[in-house]
A protein has these predicted regions:
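Hydrophobic aliphatic residue packing
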Residues: 9, 13, 21, 35, ...
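N-terminal helix-turn-helix
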Residues: 31-63
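Short, cationic-aromatic polyanion-contact patches
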Residues: 10, 34, 68-85
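Short Asp/Glu-rich motifs
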Residues: 40, 75-76, 117-118
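Beta-hairpin "wing" of winged helix-turn-helix
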Residues: 25-26, 30, 58-67, 71-74
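Extreme N-terminal segment that seeds HTH/winged-HTH DNA-binding domains in transcriptional regulators
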Residues: 1-31, 37, 85, 89, ...
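A general secondary-structure boundary signal
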Residues: 10, 46, 59-61, 69-71, ...
Length: 123
């Protein structure tokens, strides 16, 4: 993973894990790697990995079973909320950029429809 120097690394790792969860690359209830394994996987400091799990736990995305590890929540409401939150963030960024280009929302919708027709976005 390449990191953006403008955003703290732990937030980028959190977003990566959330993206894996909402795209079912990490299943609900699945055991997550240990902090050490996460640190190796993302080439981050073990303290950063621990912070990632602390924040995900605080948000209800995962939970720790003492002596067993950290697991993804099985609460579909939380997963839907994550998906909605990430979609909202993407839309806000998109709308700001569209307005900078002087394009109306209606025009943007037409551009999106046209681009979707000519592009296989499922890849």
């Amino acid at each position: 993973m390449q990191y953006d120097s403008k955003l703290p690394i732990y937030l980028q790792v959190i977003n990566s894990i959330k993206m894996d969860i909402i795209n079912n690359r990490i299943a609900c209830g699945q055991k997550l790697p240990s902090s050490r394994e996460l640190a190796v996987q993302y080439t981050i400091n073990p303290n950063t990995a621990a912070r990632v799990y602390q924040e995900l736990e605080r948000e209800g995305v995962c939970f720790t079973k003492r002596g067993m590890g950290t697991f993804v929540t099985e609460d579909e409401t939380i997963i839907r909320a994550i998906r909605s939150e990430m979609a909202d963030e993407a839309i806000v960024v998109f709308l700001k950029r569209i307005k900078e280009l002087g394009i109306s929302v209606d025009e943007a919708v037409e551009f999106i429809r046209h681009k979707e027709e000519e592009t296989d976005v499922s890849k």
